[in-house]
Amino acid sequence: MQRPATIRHRTSLFEEATSIVEIEFASDLSLDDIARRVASSRRQLQRAYAEIGNTTFREHLTAVRMDRAAEMLGMRGLTVREVAHRVGYRQPAQFAKAFRRHHGTSPSAYRSRRTPGGPDDGPRVAFEAA
């Protein structure tokens, strides 16, 4: 059984790390970078993700990116390529593969099901990056 101080410390690390990911998901983030920023070792942060979040850093980052991508695709103002870039993917094909793995469908099919009238209904609008 872990000591309460250890649990509190790991919870704090996890919360700090997830806050950074939630804000900077489109950046080129790495576990080492986040560990430095929360003043922790790579291994301690891995443990925090595993024990507190029941996930890994990479899984969390991907989930945040995919959730944001789904939101953007639902707005219909951006192409799939633009969404890919806005959530941190340089290659749209890699984005599409990750999106399909996460959501069980392609970005285009997701958009068609979520957007009234389909992907070509209505005017195109520009969105500012968050």
What residue ranges belong to the model's regions?
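Conserved phosphate-binding and hydrolysis motifs of nucleotide-dependent enzymes
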Residues: G88, R100, G104-P107
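Short amphipathic alpha-helical segment with a characteristic S/N-K-E followed by hydrophobic residues
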Residues: L45, T56-F57, L61, S106-P107
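Short hydrophobic/aromatic patch on the recognition helix
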Residues: L45-Y49, Q94-F95, F99
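An amphipathic alpha-helical interaction segment
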Residues: M1-S19, R36, Q44
